[in-house]
Amino acid sequence: YVKYTSDNKSRIDFLFTDGHPKQDAAISVYHIYYQNGEFRQTNGQKICSYSDAPVVIGKVNKVYDAVKNGVRSWIWDIALDKDNHPVITYARYPSEMKHQYYYARWDGREWNTIKVTDAGNYITIIKPGKKLLEAHYSGGIVLDHSNPDIVFLSRKIGNQFELEKRIIGANGEQQVFPLTQASRKDN
């Protein structure tokens, strides 16, 4: 699974996983970028030239290591900030009933990651007599690409999924703005 963004000039950023979280508990999050004919780690270190592709996933540094942490993950979004540094959102799944949203920003040296909020469980609706097929479908968390300090998300509050806007500060502090409340249907 992969998400892309670009500076619309010379750089393409890739956010990806090594699989689907229902298939394996060891699903991690990776980031690389392509510029001037080369694939590079987030820190700028060359991985390989375009002519040497494909990129071998085992050579790519992890943003989040599911093996080390023992919790599977899945990607949501990627944008570039005003300094052309990547900002990402993704989910972690301690269990099928407990989804968590994360926000990570590259500061030029390292990834700074914060837990945004618990997301609730899966948003998949199970029809009577049917079994759950997609336990890792969260409500979602996406970035405002014109200002990636801002995220929009859907999380379970009470019995419904509600929408929120959050502004993430430089030190991880958050301002929360509910966009829906006391809804009768999921958002």
Feature-to-residue mapping (PLM):
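Extracellular, repeat-based ectodomains that mediate carbohydrate processing or recognition
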Residues: 1-187
